[in-house]
Design a protein with these regions (language model features):
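Non-catalytic DNA-binding core/recognition domains of DNA-processing enzymes
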Residues: 1-10, 25, 150
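Surface-exposed alpha-helical interface segments used for non-catalytic interactions
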Residues: 2, 23, 44, 156, ...
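Arg/Lys-rich amphipathic alpha helix in sigma70-family domain 2
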Residues: 9-18, 160-163
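Basic, Lys/Arg- and aromatic-enriched nucleic-acid-binding interface segment
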Residues: 13, 17-90, 97-101, 135, ...
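Helix-turn-helix-type domain boundary/helix-start signal
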Residues: 15, 36-37, 148, 180, ...
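C-terminal secondary-structure termini that scaffold catalytic or DNA-interacting sites
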Residues: 48-56, 60-61, 99, 110-145, ...
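Short, basic (Lys/Arg/His-rich) helix/loop patches that form interaction surfaces
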Residues: 48-70, 80, 148, 156, ...
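Short, polar N-cap/turn motifs at the start of nucleic acid-interacting alpha helices
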Residues: 94-103, 201-202, 221-240, 264
């Protein structure tokens, strides 16, 4: 409903329709569904299982390059909390160092808007056609344009791939075997294969962002920092992505609640056996 209303609002602004009919409609009630996420140590198991996932190999690309591609894409999903379209659109020029801190200046995304003759793209987005129904566009909100710090190790592995494959500043770091943009269906296939190889529960790719939001909460990161990393416009949205695990809740509650009982004061109960 929200997406439809946004499109109709824009159509009204561009005078394509006289009025947005959604204004007179009560939004449907949507029951939230809980997103299952991996435990803190399981993403590493998933990434390490990529070479053993048993996926079908297609195209001329070397197996090591294909495996590396998925391992890096999965790591970016967890470590940087990047959206699927942001990871698929990643180019070397977005890799920056600020104050000596390596990171990604998220400036673009890949989205499906249809073939050029059929595409309907919101006026506030700058868009460039890439391939088929895929378009390279600016982020959907101002907050989505953000700098996300990454580890030195991840930074070095990204640049090693860029240099080894001769990827230009404005070329996609991740492509399929034909050099075209990664498709979500292909990533989902390899993701599920890696989950199975690692013996992990079935979770969605999008759950990686929920995992990132949850881990930042577990680390007691300030709300403004959490929303900045996630690219959200409000903390309420970030909280929607956050899942407090039992261990962290127990630790926080243990810090907050003082001891209410002296364990040294033990009452011994006498057990009386009844005889028939």
């Amino acid at each position: 409903f929200v997406s439809l209303k946004m499109m109709l609002d824009q159509a009204e602004l561009e005078e394509l329709i006289p009025v947005d009919p959604c204004r007179r409609v009560k939004p449907p009630r949507v029951e939230p569904t809980e997103t299952r996420i991996l435990s803190p140590d399981q993403p590493k198991q998933l990434i390490e299982a990529v070479p053993n996932r048993g996926a079908k190999r297609r195209g001329p690309a070397l197996t090591v390059d294909v495996d590396e591609s998925w391992m890096l894409l999965f790591e970016l999903a967890f470590a940087a909390g990047m959206r699927e379209g942001e990871r698929y659109a990643l180019m070397p020029y977005e890799l920056e160092q600020r104050d000596g801190v390596p990171g990604i200046n998220v400036q673009q995304q890949i989205q499906q808007y249809g073939k050029p003759e059929d595409a309907v793209i919101p006026a506030w987005l700058k868009a460039e056609h890439l391939y088929g129904i895929l378009w390279l566009t600016t982020p959907k909100t101002h907050a989505a344009h953000r700098f996300v710090p990454i580890s030195t190790s991840l930074w070095q592995r990204l640049w090693a791939r860029i240099k080894r494959l001769g990827i230009g500043p404005r070329d996609l770091i991740f492509t399929n075997s034909r050099g075209n943009p990664v498709r979500s269906s292909t990533e989902r296939y390899n993701w599920n294969k890696a989950l199975k190889a690692a013996g992990l529960p079935p979770v969605t790719i999008h759950s990686a962002r929920h995992w990132t939001a949850s881990m930042t909460a577990r680390a007691n990161m300030p709300d403004d920092a959490r929303t900045a990393i996630m690219g959200h416009t409000s903390i309420s949205m970030t909280n929607h992505y956050t899942h407090r695990d039992t261990a962290s809740l127990a630790a926080l509650l243990d810090q907050a609640i003082p001891d209410l009982h002296d364990d040294t004061d033990i009452i011994e109960a006498e057990i009386i056996e009844e005889t028939a």
